[in-house]
Amino acid sequence: MDSVKNILLEYGLRFQEPQIEKVDKYIEELLGVPYNLTAHRDLDSAVHKNVVEILLPLKEELKGTLLDVGSGNGVPGLILAIFFPKLKVVLLDSREKSVNFLRGVIEKLDLGNVSAVKERAENFSRERREEFDYVTARAVARLNVLVEICTPALKTGGKLLFYKGPSYIEELKEAQRAMKELKVELEEVREYSLKTGERRALLILRKYESSPEKYPRRVGVPFKRPLL
């Protein structure tokens, strides 16, 4: 079984030793929690899914403030906080068990640039409008829903970083109304593949104008009645 360090070296990813130590501890925590929090039962799978998949498409240094919506086990926000220490990261999740797990990991890894918050994305985005340089999410919802619940918290000129699978093309077509309503435009799609054979895409959307105050709609509505 490959080590975290060797797997990252295979992909040519750059890192410092303290970052590898933190990832090692994180993966240990991840594999030690009940499997309803994570589907990864071995190191190789966990590193590919939770570390390589997040870092591989990033070409630039991230700094400023970042919100991870529906953070779950901490991906992508926690990984980005480890490898981009100039980021100040908020991990947002509505489930108490996820937030408790995240707070435990933050303490064990001594991550001073990360906090975990228990709240619904619709409420948080409404309360913290125009606050973040980046908002990211993975495996939370379809793109049209993500655009509505994430964009209000993003600064004008800020970027949405959404990790998607091969179906992103269909989701992009479906999200045109939401993108227009929330005032974001597609800046770039970065397609990439893992050595496990999985195909992925990082969608980068830029907010060009403040989102209307009526968004996001109240809790649950963006999921039940998405903008189409």
UniProtKB/Swiss-Prot annotation:
Keywords: Cytoplasm, Methyltransferase, rRNA processing, S-adenosyl-L-methionine, Transferase. Pfam families: GidB (PF02527). It is found in: Cytoplasm. GO terms for molecular function: rRNA (guanine-N7-)-methyltransferase activity. S-adenosyl-L-methionine binds at G70, A121, E122, R138. Belongs to the methyltransferase superfamily. RNA methyltransferase RsmG family. Specifically methylates the N7 position of a guanine in 16S rRNA. This is Ribosomal RNA small subunit methyltransferase G. It comes from Thermotoga sp. (strain RQ2). The gene is rsmG.
